[in-house]
Swiss-Prot record:
Effect of residue 12 to A: No effect on the interaction with CSN8
Species lineage: Eukaryota, Viridiplantae, Streptophyta, Embryophyta, Tracheophyta
Gene source species: Arabidopsis thaliana
Entry keyword Signal: no
Protein name: COP9 signalosome complex subunit 7
Family: Belongs to the CSN7/EIF3M family. CSN7 subfamily.
Length: 260
């Protein structure tokens, strides 16, 4: 079972339970959700009306905790630890996993130095063990550890819950991408038309060149015929006259009498 399917089943169960809980029972359920080893999305629980009603009550810290796991990082928790519930080891692990997902949203190459600061890890061995055992084996990221360059290359990372305002930014980005794609398509179509026109012109020029060659061939053929006839006239008829004249002026041989 992949991570998305597993999460869907867990979320469905928790949403059903949370939707019928009273406010005093929501705190333990939120702690359970944020500690679950296979749950990395919390927006559906956060969207429940009775969960939203925790705002302004004595249990509002659990609502803040749920928001932290939906959108925040380990660094955010450290900055607000005094007004949030104390985290269990499972929750700390979960929040650090979510921190890696947040970092991978904007960068596909994560330097070890950045990760060690963001995760409060003191050495490379500990960091690499965490990335392998708690992130890659958990299925939330796919990547490669580059010990020479001291970085974590992340071609895939599971998505987190959308932060407030993030959907609008995504729509704006998609709109810009769509406009760019349309302009690119128009440019490609123009280039295709230009190529077609050039092809037609090339065919036309080639045809004209072939016709020109044929005309030259015909002209040369006609000139050759004329030259041959001229040569026959120059060297054929005068030769006959000369023979005639030679025959006309040739002296006749006298026959001498024979003496006996």
């Amino acid at each position: 079972m992949d991570i998305e399917q597993k999460q869907a089943e867990i979320i469905d169960q928790l949403v059903k339970r949370a939707s019928t809980c009273k406010s005093e029972a929501l705190g333990p359920l939120i702690i359970e959700a944020t500690s679950h080893p296979s749950l990395f999305a919390f927006s559906e629980i956060l969207a429940l009306p009775n969960v939203a009603q925790l705002e302004g009550t004595t249990d509002s810290v659990y609502l803040d905790l749920l928001r932290l796991f939906a959108h925040g990082t380990w660094g955010d928790y450290k900055c607000n630890a005094t007004r949030l519930p104390h985290l269990s080891p499972d929750q700390i692990l979960k929040l650090k996993q979510l921190t890696v997902l947040t970092l991978a949203e904007s960068n596909k190459v994560l330097p070890y130095d950045t990760l060690m600061v963001e995760l409060d890890v003191s050495n490379v061995r500990e960091l690499e063990d965490f990335l392998i055992n708690e992130c890659m084996y958990a299925g939330i990221v796919r990547g490669k550890l580059d010990q020479l360059k001291r970085c974590f290359e992340v071609p895939f990372a599971a998505g987190r819950d959308l932060r407030p305002g993030q959907l609008g930014n995504m729509l704006h980005t998609l709109s810009n991408w769509l406009n760019t794609s349309e302009n690119l398509l128009i440019s490609i179509q123009d280039k295709i038309k230009w190529a077609d026109n050039m092809s037609e012109m090339d065919k036309k020029h080639r045809k004209e060149a072939e016709e020109g060659v044929e005309e030259v061939k015909k002209s040369l053929s006609m000139k050759g015929d004329v030259d041959i006839r001229g040569n026959k006239e120059m060297f054929g008829e005068p030769s006959g006259v000369m023979d005639y004249e030679e025959d006309g002026i040739r002296p006749k041989r006298r026959r001498h009498p024979v003496t006996r």
